[in-house]
Amino acid sequence: MVKTQRVVITPGEPAGIGPDLVVQLAQREWPVELVVCADATLLIDRAAMLGLPLTLRPYSPNSPAQPQTTGTLTLLPVALRESVTAGQLAIENGHYVVETLARACDGCLNGEFAALITGPVHKGVINDAGIPFTGHTEFFEERSQAKKVVMMLATEELRVALATTHLPLRDIADAITPALLHEVIAILHHDLRTKFGIAEPRILVCGLNPHAGEGGHMGTEEIDTIIPVLDELRAQGMKLNGPLPADTLFQPKYLDNADAVLAMYHDQGLPVLKYQGFGRGVNITLGLPFIRTSVDHGTALELAGRGKADVGSFITALNLAIKMIVNTQ
């Protein structure tokens, strides 16, 4: 890395394990400065509950970034709306969570931060606070005014991107259009090159129907939509293999020769990835004008403040973001 970069972190739901995980991140050195967008008292109290040392350094945007030393975090303060009891949701803190996301996103857009790593949020309590919220991905897409974003989950061995995300199953076939596939594959291909440093990405593409339609006998979306799009993009030089049946695609003979998989819908691709790498997975938002990675688990309210939360996914998300920063420099 040419110079030390700043990475901004949002711990997520304050009553969940996000603050625990951020405190655990501080128990080692990092080659980047970790700027945590959070309430100071929340982090200090949670560190005390866990019996871990923590010193908060003030965020100084006009000073050069410094590698993070053991036992420290850099604090970008955002005040809680209500005091926090570990494991107990407070509706007003839905506003606090969104404020941390907005400040972190804006800091990435204005060049303060080289990447954003997000902890788990509780969508229900944010909506109960009167804030329409479907997820991090959609929030950052709207706030950054990105034309289109793509959700990809990854472990060290497997990357799975989604053509559609949080849609009811009955709506998916209608959503798989030529325009959508062109857009999603273009973003996936571009970000594999620019953010992952893969010169000529090799992408496996799932069919939509069982057996990838069985030649039109089990649905015609492959013939009518997916194959024509793939043929057009192959003619432009993209290395695309598919459409392949999803029940056979996830085998070494295919995966060993691929850099990513494009699944048509959420539950087609993610169960395999989460089984293969549960606790080590990372959620990446492609198509944003900045790097964003996230843990692939929830708030685990029952574990908050107990010292039993696994920091593995957060570490993987941070390490991946650092690699992506290097690739984009």
Curated annotation (Swiss-Prot):
Its main location: cytoplasm. InterPro entries: PdxA, PdxA_fam. Binds 1 divalent metal cation per subunit. Can use ions such as Zn(2+), Mg(2+) or Co(2+). One of its GO terms (cellular component) is cytoplasm. Its cofactor is Zn(2+); Mg(2+); Co(2+). This is 4-hydroxythreonine-4-phosphate dehydrogenase. It holds the Pfam family PdxA. The gene is pdxA. It is found in: Cytoplasm. Its EC number is 1.1.1.262. It comes from the Bacteria. The keyword NADP applies. A divalent metal cation binds at H166, H211, H266. Pathway: Cofactor biosynthesis; pyridoxine 5'-phosphate biosynthesis; pyridoxine 5'-phosphate from D-erythrose 4-phosphate: step 4/5. GO terms for molecular function: 4-hydroxythreonine-4-phosphate dehydrogenase activity; cobalt ion binding; magnesium ion binding; NAD binding; zinc ion binding.
